[in-house]
Amino acid sequence: MPGWLAVPRDWLASLGEIARFCGRTMGLVYSGRVLQFFGEALRQAGILITGSALVIWGLVFILGLSSCGIEAAYLNRSLGAPAYAGVFSAWCDLREVVPYAFGYMMSAKVGTGIVAELGAMRISDEIDALEVMGVPPMVFLAATRLLAAWMVFPFLFLSSVGIAFFASWLAVVKQIGDVSSGGYFLIFWMFQNPPDLLFSLIKGMAISTAIVLVGCYYGYTASGGPVGVGTATAKSMVLNIVLVHVISMMGTLVFWGANPRAPIGG
C-alpha cells in the first residue's frame, strides 16, 4: 500500500475501534448488565453534578448575557426593531449557544477527566486487577459512566437553557431596557415552542453521549505510561471538539433545516 494511504488507513482503523467500543458500551447499558453496579453509576452521577454543574451554568449565563442578550438588543436597535430582541434569545440560546457551550465544557471538563482517570487505572494495572477479581471492567468503568451521564445530563442541559434565557432577559430588559418585560416575552414565546426544546435536548444528549463514550475509549485503551495518558487526553479533546460541531450542525439541519419554525410570512 502506498505510504500516503497509511494515515487515512490508520484513521479509519481508529474510528472502527471507537465505534466498536461505543457499541459494546451502549449494549451493556441497554441489556441491563450495568444495573449490577447501579451504586457506582449513582456515585458517578453525583461526581458529574458536583463537579460540572456550576461550571456549565456559569458559562451559559455569560454567553446568554453577552452573545444572545446584549448583542441582540443592540443589533435590533440598529435595525429599528428593538422590541424583537426576544427572537434572538429564543433561537440563539436554545438552538445553538447552549448546545455548543454544553459540548465545549463537557469536552474540557468531563471528557478529559474520564480519560485521565481511566488512563491512570490502565497504566497502573488497576483495570487488569478488576478482571482478576472477576469484575467486568467494561461494565464497571465505561457502562456506569454512560448510565450516569444519561441520568444527569438532561437535568443539566434543561437547567442550562433556563439560565441562558434568564441571562438574555436580564441583559435586554433590565440592563439595556429597550423593551418591557411583557413585550420581550410576547415575542420570545412567539418564536419558540415545545418541539424546539425537545430538539435542542436531543442535540445536547447526542453531544454528551459522544463525549462520554470517546473519553471512556481513550482512557480504557491508554498505554505508554503517563505520557501515553497525556497523549490520549489530547486526542480525546480534539475528537470531541470535532464531534460537537458535526453533531450540532447535523441536528440543526435535521430539526430546522427544512422548517425554521418561525411565525413569519404567509
Write out the residue ranges for each language-model feature:
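Active-site cofactor/substrate anionic-group-binding motifs, chiefly glycine-
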Residues: 48-101, 105
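Selective transmembrane-helix segments that form parts of the transport pathway or gating/packing helices
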Residues: 49, 53, 57, 97, ...
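Hydrophobic alpha-helical segments of membrane proteins
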Residues: 53-65, 69, 150, 154, ...
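Membrane-interfacial helix-loop-helix connectors in multipass membrane proteins
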Residues: 70-94, 163-205, 214-235, 258-266
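Hydrophobic alpha-helical transmembrane segments of multi-pass membrane transport proteins
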Residues: 85-128, 214
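C-terminal transmembrane helix-loop-helix hairpin of multi-pass membrane proteins
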Residues: 227, 231-249
